């Protein structure tokens, strides 16, 4: 089982799925109920493809599995120069917490025994810096953490019961998040009662050696990480031979490893992966749900609600074709469908801004002039 697919606004792989508006657009709807519908549709499509692949038996070896998603991104967007800003729900911790909470609930479902999928909120914590993003140190007061950076994660863990969480690349107050016992043991396990499993961001454990310069070698990284409570590595450089060496040299105990393995395997058990498929009602979701008309209509409605009008000189919008003779559409992005970070292959046919305007204008024979460059 390969942990780690993406479902930020639709499933990324394998195959075609319904693509919904980018995360920052989902937040712009200000509609938590709608976001629950979106993530429920996403998890339905995951189960549909899972059944199509004979519950994983026909899946390509080494490919990301369909039932564990590294979503949503509930970091605070403080600087638009940060490349992952579109993955977030914006700069407000309350809105992000509410939207993130509903997204987690929709992904995981409400069955008393089984999870529909595993949701993994990320990146914990204080991760919103582009410069030296893999090794920077966020110096934070307790108040800044508790009032601004942590509330969105708390909602996802405490209220929505997310069963996994991803640690961030950066350090907080001098300690890389990968091994930050304050965040892992005090906040997550202690204050919030988190009982799921904790995964690193990709390559983060080895970067404690090469980028943070926090430990001397991979053996030390493995020792520090497993003892801090990191259950799963995204990658295969540290929790492999280095961890085995650390165990053989009595740097880590069998209990350390067993505890991590227990939490990871518990997540798979909650998905029903060790049970007869017929016992899990989510396994009855048919592949026909993928890209179905209902989901395409939901994507369209979400796109409509996600729109933000920044400027409207002389009340030009909405377009009144009785008063307009020609329309100029300027900019290369108007003729190109850009779905955003972590986009899958769309089952639904994309419509660009230019295509939409042309289709609307042709009703009244209004000329549309397109200039990709000015």
Task: List each model region and its residues.
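Glycoside hydrolase catalytic-domain context in secreted enzymes
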Residues: 1-374
């Amino acid at each position: 089982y390969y942990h780690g697919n993406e479902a930020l606004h639709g499933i990324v792989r394998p195959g075609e799925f319904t693509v919904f508006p980018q995360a920052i657009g989902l937040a712009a709807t200000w509609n938590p109920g709608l976001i629950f519908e979106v993530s429920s549709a996403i998890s339905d499509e995951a189960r549909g493809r899972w059944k199509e692949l004979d519950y994983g038996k026909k899946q390509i070896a080494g490919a990301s599995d369909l039932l564990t998603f590294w979503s949503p991104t509930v970091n605070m967007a403080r600087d638009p120069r940060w490349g992952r800003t579109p993955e977030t729900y914006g700069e407000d911790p309350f809105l992000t917490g509410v939207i993130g909470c509903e997204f987690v609930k929709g992904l995981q479902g409400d069955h008393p025994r089984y999870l529909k999928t595993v949701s993994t909120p990320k990146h914990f914590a204080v991760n919103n810096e582009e410069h030296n993003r893999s090794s920077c140190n966020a110096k934070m007061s307790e108040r800044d953490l508790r009032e601004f950076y942590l509330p969105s994660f708390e909602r996802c863990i405490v209220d929505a019961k997310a069963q996994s969480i991803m640690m961030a690349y950066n350090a907080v107050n001098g300690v890389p998040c990968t091994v930050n016992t304050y965040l892992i043991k005090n906040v997550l396990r202690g204050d919030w009662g988190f009982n799921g499993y904790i995964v690193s961001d990709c390559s983060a454990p080895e970067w404690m050696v090469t980028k943070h310069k926090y430990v001397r070698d991979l053996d030390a990284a493995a020792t520090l990480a497993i003892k801090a409570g990191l259950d799963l590595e995204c990658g295969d450089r540290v929790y492999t031979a280095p961890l085995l060496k650390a165990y053989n040299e009595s740097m880590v105990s069998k209990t350390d490893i067993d505890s991590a393995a227990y939490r990871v395997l518990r997540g798979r058990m909650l998905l029903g992966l060790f049970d007869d498929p017929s016992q899990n009602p989510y396994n009855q979701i048919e592949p026909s749900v993928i890209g179905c008309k209902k989901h395409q209509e939901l994507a369209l409605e979400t796109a409509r609600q996600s729109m933000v009008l920044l400027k409207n000189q002389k009340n030009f919008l909405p377009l009144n074709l009785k008063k307009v003779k020609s329309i100029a559409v300027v900019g290369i992005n108007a003729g190109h469908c850009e779905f955003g970070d972590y986009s899958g292959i769309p089952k639904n046919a994309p419509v660009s801004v230019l295509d939409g305007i042309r289709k609307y204008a042709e009703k009244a024979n209004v000329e549309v002039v397109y200039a990709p460059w000015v």
